[in-house]
Amino acid sequence: MKRIAVFPSGGDAPGMNAAIRAVVRKAISEGMEVYGINRGYAGMVDGDIFPLGSKEVGDKISRGGTFLYSARYPEFAQLEGQLAGIEQLKKHGIEGVVVIGGDGSYHGAMRLTEHGFPAVGIPGTIDNDIAGTDYTIGFDTAVNTAVEAIDKLRDTSSSHGRTFVVEVMGRNAGDIALWAGIASGADQIIVPEEEFDIEKVASTIQYDFEHKGKNHHIIVLAEGVMSGEAFAQKLKEAGDKSDLRVTNLGHILRGGSPTARDRVIASWMGSHAVELLKEGKGGLAVGIHNEELVESPILGTAEEGALFSLTEEGKIIVNNPHKARLDFAALNRSLSQ
């Protein structure tokens, strides 16, 4: 394989630029040419494809977002869109692609593979909801950004004796909420994977203020449960009388310079993706498991999902058998007593 392309797709995540940089520089070191594609699958279909060299990625490792831009392109789910994209790739002499993104991006890569066009996926999403990897690019940065924000909200919450509901991204997964909640010492964490009793949540707030002498109460809420405003309304209906505020951290979690960890795993996975294409291997997704590189079929990775669930004993079971987690939900309950 002499010429490959790389592009991000779907929602952006800190560290995508580091992955693109790694793909470009590794490929060049292996004697391959690299092309970039702007705006993901939309740019592929439109022919927004151009050469990338070491110079073009020279100052990108520390930047958040993605300099190749990104977009969602639902039309690629249709055969017409897929064939149009492949036609453009062949027109530019490209023999394989590296796709950086989440499950929607993986589905596109899966379609390319089914049409006999080698594609390798790299997990790039702050949600950390991709099967076949312990961590996705952008997750660590998003968690650190959330923790920094929650720490600051705790300051003002303590000053006024308030309850704060902090809504964080994550789509249908509670990973960001769990990690950020534990790291920030949240009083309660609400995630899609675990049922909750709104009356118990409300009574816990009251007990903390009246009997434990607390001057604040922080609830971290995953967006996959419901919106922060809707949750606050339910709290009031359940009898909460505290001075309640809602903060939605929103897209701020997608921005900012990536952490060292995100830069390293992005570089590691990007380099390995090139090695796979050089060997003529497509239809694979790169991941990290137990701090080692792993590969899994992109078909299974895109279809399986990586959401975790809880047993009656509170033990977290991850649907991806290659992924292990601490019992974070139970851990937080014990630490917030």
Swiss-Prot record:
Reaction equations catalysed: beta-D-fructose 6-phosphate + ATP = beta-D-fructose 1,6-bisphosphate + ADP + H(+)
Keywords: Allosteric enzyme, ATP-binding, Cytoplasm, Glycolysis, Kinase, Magnesium, Metal-binding, Nucleotide-binding, Transferase
One Gene Ontology MF term: 6-phosphofructokinase activity
Subunit structure, as described in the record: Homotetramer.
Segments forming a coiled coil: none
Subcellular localization(s) per the UniProt record: Cytoplasm
Protein name: ATP-dependent 6-phosphofructokinase
Binding site for substrate: T125, I126, D127, R162, M169, G170, R171, E223, R245, H251, I252, L253, R254
UniProt: ADP binding residues: R21, A22, V23, V24, R25, R154, G185, A186, D187, K212, K214, N215, H216
Residues engaged in binding ATP: G11, R72, Y73, G102, D103, G104, S105
Matching Gene3D superfamilies: 3.40.50.450, Phosphofructokinase domain
Physiological role: Catalyzes the phosphorylation of D-fructose 6-phosphate to fructose 1,6-bisphosphate by ATP, the first committing step of glycolysis.
Binding, Mg(2+): D103
Activity control summary: Allosterically activated by ADP and other diphosphonucleosides, and allosterically inhibited by phosphoenolpyruvate.
CC terms in the record's Gene Ontology section: 6-phosphofructokinase complex
Biochemical pathway: Carbohydrate degradation; glycolysis; D-glyceraldehyde 3-phosphate and glycerone phosphate from D-glucose: step 3/4
Family to which the UniProt record says this protein belongs: Belongs to the phosphofructokinase type A (PFKA) family. ATP-dependent PFK group I subfamily. Prokaryotic clade 'B1' sub-subfamily.
PROSITE patterns on file: PHOSPHOFRUCTOKINASE (PS00433)
An example Gene Ontology biological process: canonical glycolysis
Residues annotated as catalytic: D127
Cofactor requirement: Mg(2+)
EC nos: 2.7.1.11
